[in-house]
């Protein structure tokens, strides 16, 4: 496999280039085969890179983009008012062959709209979905959508399930178990969209559909792919991250309560460090946009250096597996592909996506 080349929107996120550039350079140093394209205000990026004299400049390129998309900007403004934004230029690097993937911590709605306009969707796909892996009692579970589509008809949930199954297969899962997130496992439970999606999935030959799953079943590892709309998925993801942080803090506080507790804590320190590492949301940062004719990974806007590095690693993994090609090869098995891009509708029609 050729060395992965990843375009970085260096101006996005809550912390901007002062976090993203050092994180990117650290990732570059840790991965000898990796090549990065930093996109943003070139004079500032050069200054930040100069603070790291050991950087292998043969594997680093800086592309100027004088404009930036703010975290509270509406997608329509990003699409029509900023033709030289770092987000757009990074996506254009993928479209034009200068990079194989794009990573951004910027505004989610703007990234979705720009990605659909610049890269287009795969034939048969109406809208891309954001997917990430969540830890369970067993192997990690893929959850989608995570906020790119807050309202989803049944057909879109069906498409998400297909894309999630293909993504799970690319990670080595055989016949991945697919489930719809619902308020109960009984067939009578759920809203109309979920019930209609279930009917579609039950008829899908070649898809290992297991029915409805509740939130606790996800963490028990009862499915390899869990599908929901972006409204539910975004709340579930961020609630899970908050819960993980609280649990780690509670455990650490317990071992500081007394001298005896501190002694026990010192003995258990290796296990505590392992628990903290396994529950650390940063290592799961980076949601892939499935359904595009190119690879795009969204980092949390609030991610620190470790989280952003995880998003870069996710992009490199997607490049290795060539997810768009795998999806393109499999879509016709599950629904009619008519050759249209699936992305010709007005990408600014919905401005209500979450910003991070």
Curated annotation (Swiss-Prot):
Superkingdom of this protein's organism: Bacteria
Pathway in which this enzyme or protein is active: Lipid metabolism; phospholipid metabolism
Protein name: Phosphate acyltransferase
Keyword Nucleus: no
Pfam family, one: FA_synthesis
Enzyme's top EC category: transferase
A GO molecular function held by the record: phosphate:acyl-[acyl carrier protein] acyltransferase activity
GO cellular component, one term: cytoplasm
Subcellular locations according to the entry: Cytoplasm
Lipid metabolism keyword on record: yes
InterPro entries with a match to the protein in the record: FA_synthesis, Phospholipid_synth_PlsX-like
One of the GO biological process terms: fatty acid biosynthetic process
Ranges annotated as spanning the membrane: none
Protein function: Catalyzes the reversible formation of acyl-phosphate (acyl-PO(4)) from acyl-[acyl-carrier-protein] (acyl-ACP). This enzyme utilizes acyl-ACP as fatty acyl donor, but not acyl-CoA.
Gene3D superfamilies: Isopropylmalate Dehydrogenase
Gene designation per UniProt: plsX
Major location (coarse): cytoplasm
């Amino acid at each position: 496999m050729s060395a992965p080349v990843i375009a970085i929107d260096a101006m996005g996120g809550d912390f901007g280039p002062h976090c993203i550039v050092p994180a990117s350079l650290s990732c570059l140093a840790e991965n000898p085969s990796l090549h990065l394209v930093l996109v943003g205000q070139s004079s500032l990026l050069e200054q930040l890179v100069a603070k790291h004299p050991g950087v292998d400049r043969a594997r680093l390129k800086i592309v100027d983009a004088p404009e930036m998309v703010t975290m509270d900007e509406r997608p329509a403004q990003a699409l029509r008012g900023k033709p030289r934004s770092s987000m757009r230029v990074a996506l254009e690097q993928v479209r034009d062959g200068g990079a194989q993937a794009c990573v951004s911590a910027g505004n989610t709605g703007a990234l979705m709209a720009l990605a659909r306009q610049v890269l287009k969707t795969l034939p048969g796909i109406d809208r891309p979905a954001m997917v990430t892996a969540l830890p369970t009692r067993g192997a990690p579970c893929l959850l989608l959508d995570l906020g790119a589509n807050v309202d989803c008809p049944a057909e879109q949930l069906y498409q998400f399930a297909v894309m999630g199954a293909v993504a799970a297969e690319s990670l080595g899962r055989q016949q991945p178990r697919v489930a719809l997130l619902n308020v109960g496992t009984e067939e009578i439970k759920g809203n109309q969209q979920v019930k209609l999606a279930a009917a579609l999935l039950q008829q899908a030959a070649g898809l290992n559909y297991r029915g409805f799953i509740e939130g606790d079943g996800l963490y028990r590892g009862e499915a390899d792919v869990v599908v929901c709309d972006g409204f539910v998925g975004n709340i579930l993801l961020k609630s899970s991250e908050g819960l993980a942080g609280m649990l780690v803090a509670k455990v650490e506080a317990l071992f500081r309560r007394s001298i005896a507790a501190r002694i026990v804590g010192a003995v258990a320190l290796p296990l505590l460090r392992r628990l903290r590492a396994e529950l650390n949301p940063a290592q799961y940062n980076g949601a892939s946009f499935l359904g595009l004719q190119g690879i795009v990974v969204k980092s949390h806007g609030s991610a620190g250096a470790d989280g952003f590095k995880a998003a870069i690693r996710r992009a490199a993994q997607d490049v290795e597996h060539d997810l768009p090609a795998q999806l393109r090869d499999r879509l016709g098995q599950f629904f009619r592909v008519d050759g249209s891009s699936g992305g010709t509708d007005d990408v600014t029609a919905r401005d209500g996506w979450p910003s991070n």
